[in-house]
Amino acid sequence: MLGELIFLLRSLHGFLASSGPIGAALAWLISFKPILFAFLLLLLLLSNWLVKQEHNLAPSPPQEEAETTTAPEVHPKNNVKNKEELEKINACFALQDKVLERLMFSEMKLKALENQVFVIWNKINRRRWSSRQRNFSRRRHRSRRHDSTFSTLSKCTTVTPTECD
């Protein structure tokens, strides 16, 4: 999925660059991987903050009623009151279940976004590491070749000419 997303972003790069200032800004974000990573991390933090604010700012009216009522007294003679209280309690439980379900869904979305950010981060670092490792191994390989060449020449310059064969 991430590979398809990267392919899509690469194919849209030219189109975005020619579509105006917003497209040019998006093309610039795509071309610089660390800035893209920082942008995704900022989106992750923003979405986390929005989930917390959504929960704090929007208390539902049944929940407020449940907070203001005191503990009910048990009267076996008053069955109608007990049924109403049971309905209120069931409504509160249903509300709690809905809130918990929304929070868990939001948490799952945040985890998925976080995983995508880390996948991109690992791909960026893997490319950097592989290029460093490739350059380092080339340098090491060159020095070995030179060492072997010099050792071969030094063997050929010894007194016995049979070592060169």
UniProtKB/Swiss-Prot annotation:
Q: In which tissues is it expressed?
A: Testis-specific.
Tell me what organism the protein belongs to: Mus musculus (Mouse)
Keywords, sorted A to Z: Fertilization, Membrane, Signal, Transmembrane, Transmembrane helix
Q: How does it sit in the membrane?
A: Single-pass membrane protein
Q: What is this protein called?
A: Testis expressed 46
Task: Give the residue spans that cross the bilayer.
Answer: 26-46
Deletion phenotype, per the entry, is: Male mice are sterile. Spermatozoa show motility defects, lack the typical hooked sperm head appearance and fail to penetrate through the egg zona pellucida.
What is the purpose of this protein?
Answer: Essential for male fertility, sperm head formation and sperm penetration through the egg zona pellucida.
Among InterPro entries, the record links this protein to: TEX46-like (IPR038788)
The main location is membrane
Give an example GO cellular component term for this record: membrane
May I ask which residue range the UniProt record assigns to the signal sequence? 1-24
Cellular location(s): Membrane
State the Gene Ontology BP annotations.
single fertilization
